[in-house]
């Protein structure tokens, strides 16, 4: 059975009477070979011999091999050999593989952002570890910390004042709420007196002037309420925006101080150790990082000093005006001096909201 296989494959190749390969088979294979070759390369430009396929001479016929043939010499013709087909396939596949080598470089480029993020995470973790160690050392009394006595005293005073201002703000809001309820009650009481003055003829005058008194008190109460609300809004802006912004800068300054002390401690520990070829690069790198954080600390300390100075000036200016408004409005209200109360609001440019009237739109304000 094993010997029949070569005979069957050889029997499939048609041969003419003079021993040459049949023209029909030759033209069919040449057409297949043209399809398998790369574009732009003709069959006549390709010279293929039997030595190109591991010395396999199966299916290769040279022109003029048979004696007595008057036909002109034919070029080398390659029969449909499995070895030839496999090598052509490998050659074409190799070219396709070569052209697809580009995306590998792109894949390396895609990895670059991930590596950068990984490096940022590594630096952040190292910095967090150093700062946490510094904080724990300070709380345990083992580590040293840099202290600016004058600046630290100003920061402590600012935080203490902020708590006191918040307490004043809370009490003023309570007073405003209670005054609003009292004004609302006075209005209702004035309306009730006015109604009874119309229905009770014998007590018409008594109910009438009580109604007028309650309405006047309600009107003055609304004026005082406007002054108190203006005072609350101004103090709220000072406490929760201006002072809070300064405290945010103070927080950044404290973080910069912790980082500075952490890298300063590392540099001091390295300087106390031996100096050799292994430790010198570490000392230089630690010195570089220490210098960076020292400059950052100095910059934040300067920013905090400037902000504290401007905050103090702004705070004095705002509170001086608001405290004068609060005092004048309350004194005029309880003295029953309606004219002075109205002048106080005009002096501090306080506008009262008319009940039932919405605020003007931005087009009307133009």
From Swiss-Prot:
Biased composition annotated in UniProt, kind: Basic and acidic residues: 22-35
Residue ranges occupied by any AH domain in the UniProt entry: 146-346
InterPro entries reported for this sequence: AH/BAR_dom_sf, AH_dom, Arfaptin_fam
Keywords: Acetylation, Golgi apparatus, Membrane, Phosphoprotein
The UniProt record lists the keyword Aminoacyl-tRNA synthetase: no
A biological process term (GO) from this entry: intracellular protein transport
Subcellular localization: Golgi apparatus; Golgi apparatus, trans-Golgi network membrane
Sites of Phosphothreonine modification: 354
Annotated GO MF terms: phosphatidylinositol-4-phosphate binding; phospholipid binding; protein domain specific binding
Keyword Acetylation (UniProt): yes
Chain intervals for the UniProt region annotation (Disordered): 1-78
Phosphoserine sites (modified residues): 5, 36, 39, 69, 79, 125
GO CC annotation: cytosol; Golgi membrane; trans-Golgi network membrane
Comp. bias (Polar residues): 44-53
Domain of life from the UniProt record: Eukaryota
Signal peptide (from-to): none
N-acetylalanine PTM positions: 2
Role played: Plays a role in controlling biogenesis of secretory granules at the trans-Golgi network. Mechanistically, binds ARF-GTP at the neck of a growing secretory granule precursor and forms a protective scaffold. Once the granule precursor has been completely loaded, active PRKD1 phosphorylates ARFIP1 and releases it from ARFs. In turn, ARFs induce fission. Through this mechanism, ensures proper secretory granule formation at the Golgi of pancreatic beta cells.
Subunit: Forms homodimers or heterodimers with ARFIP2. Interacts with non-myristoylated GTP-bound ARF3, but not to GDP-bound ARF3. Interacts with ARF1. Binds with lower affinity to ARF5 and with very little affinity to ARF6. Interacts with ARL1. Interacts with ATG9A.
UniProt name for this protein: Arfaptin-1
Species this chain originates from: Rattus norvegicus (Rat)
Encoding gene, per UniProt annotation: Arfip1
């Amino acid at each position: 059975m094993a010997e029949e296989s070569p005979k069957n494959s050889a029997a499939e190749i048609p041969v003419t009477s003079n021993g040459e390969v049949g023209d029909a088979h030759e033209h069919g294979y040449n057409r297949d070979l043209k399809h398998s070759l790369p574009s732009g390369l003709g069959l006549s430009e390709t010279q293929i011999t039997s030595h190109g396929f591991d010395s396999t001479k199966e299916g290769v016929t040279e022109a003029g091999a048979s004696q007595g043939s008057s036909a002109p010499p034919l070029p080398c013709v390659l029969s449909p050999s499995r070895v030839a087909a496999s090598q052509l396939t490998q050659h074409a596949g190799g070219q396709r593989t070569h052209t697809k080598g580009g995306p590998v470089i792109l894949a390396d480029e895609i990895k670059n952002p991930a590596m950068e993020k990984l490096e940022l995470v590594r630096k952040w973790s190292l910095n967090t570890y150093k700062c946490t160690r510094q904080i724990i050392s300070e709380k345990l009394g083992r580590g040293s910390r840099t202290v600016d006595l004058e600046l630290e005293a100003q920061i402590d005073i600012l935080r203490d004042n902020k708590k006191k201002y918040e307490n004043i703000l809370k009490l003023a809001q309570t007073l405003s709420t209670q005054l609003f309820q009292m004004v609302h009650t006075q209005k209702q009481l004035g309306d009730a007196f006015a109604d009874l003055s119309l229905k009770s003829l014998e007590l018409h005058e008594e109910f009438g002037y009580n109604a007028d008194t309650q309405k006047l008190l309600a009107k003055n109460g609304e004026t005082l309420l406007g002054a108190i609300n203006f005072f609350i809004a101004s103090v709220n802006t000072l406490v929760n925006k201006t002072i809070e912004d300064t405290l945010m800068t103070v927080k950044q300054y404290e973080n910069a101080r912790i980082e500075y002390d952490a890298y300063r401690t590392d540099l001091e520990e390295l300087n106390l150790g031996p100096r050799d070829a292994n430790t010198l690069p570490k000392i230089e790198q630690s010195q570089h990082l220490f210098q960076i954080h020292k400059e950052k600390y100095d910059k934040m300390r300067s920013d905090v000093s400037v902000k504290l100075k401007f905050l103090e000036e702004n705070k004095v200016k705002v509170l001086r005006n608001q405290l004068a408004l609060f005092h004048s409005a309350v004194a005029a209200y309880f003295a029953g001096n309606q004219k002075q109360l109205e002048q106080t609001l005009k002096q501090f440019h306080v506008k009262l909201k008319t009940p039932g009237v919405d605020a003007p739109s931005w087009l009307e304000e133009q």
